[in-house]
Amino acid sequence: NGEETEDKFYKVYEPLNVEKGFRFSYTPAGKKPQRYINGLSELKAAYHKMNSEEEKEWQRTHDDDKPYKEKKLPEAFICSGERDSLCCQSMGYHPLWFNSETYSLSAEEYREIMKYVEVLYNIPDIDETGRRKGTELALTYIDIHTVWLPDWLASYKDNRGHGRKDLRDWMAKKKKKKDFKNLMANALPARFWVEWLTKDGKKKYEIDTACLYNFLSLNGFH
């Protein structure tokens, strides 16, 4: 596919280390780029693999000279960390995650991701920081579909007495893939209008009421 081979690095966990700042580290030192999206390399590989297989099938079933047109993967999910990403992948989806919850996705990084997928979902934590960052991302890139986990999840406590807040916690209560698909079905973008071309080539716009309510809610109107 013509892309450069990336340097490999590993994240080492020491969850029982008494020093919180040393519970994980990266090795070899200096190999991890300053900005890095975990899962993006795997997403690209899945995209190229799918299109390679689709193109072979196209060539097998088409005798004309019409070239094969590359297709995007249906979706990918921004998750809030490794645990959530493993849960997402266990259901057959492509996870992406950042090195910290406060990471700001750049416009260039967003465009790069959207080369490979039709829809990008975000599954933020439902604590204060997660809601704030999830709202911020939704309003920055208005085509991202935000999967808000249900409020009832926070009524369950972890071993430190804190409310449950992430996808891994949710999957401890809802293990069926159809439950996750229901979450996906309720995920909305902040873009509240749709556009299409008429038969004579004119562009038309229409308000999507559900997305408009979502946009207003993201901006603090309830």
Stretch-by-stretch model annotation:
Residues 1-116, 134:
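Phosphate-handling DNA/RNA-contact segment within nucleic-acid enzymes
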Residues 74, 85, 92-95, 119-121, ...:
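Conserved NTP-binding/hydrolysis core of motor NTPases
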Residues 76-78, 117-129, 148-151:
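Acidic beta-strand-to-loop metal/phosphate-binding motif
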Residues 99-104, 125-126, 151-153:
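Short, acidic/turn-prone active-site loops that include or flank metal/cofactor-
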Residues 104-112, 132, 156-167:
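Short, charged, surface-exposed secondary-structure boundary motifs
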Residues 132-143:
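Short, aromatic/basic amphipathic alpha-helical patches
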Residues 139, 155-197:
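Short, small/acidic-rich helices and loops at N termini and domain boundaries
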Residues 188-222:
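N-terminal nucleic-acid engagement/recognition segments and initiation subdomains in replication
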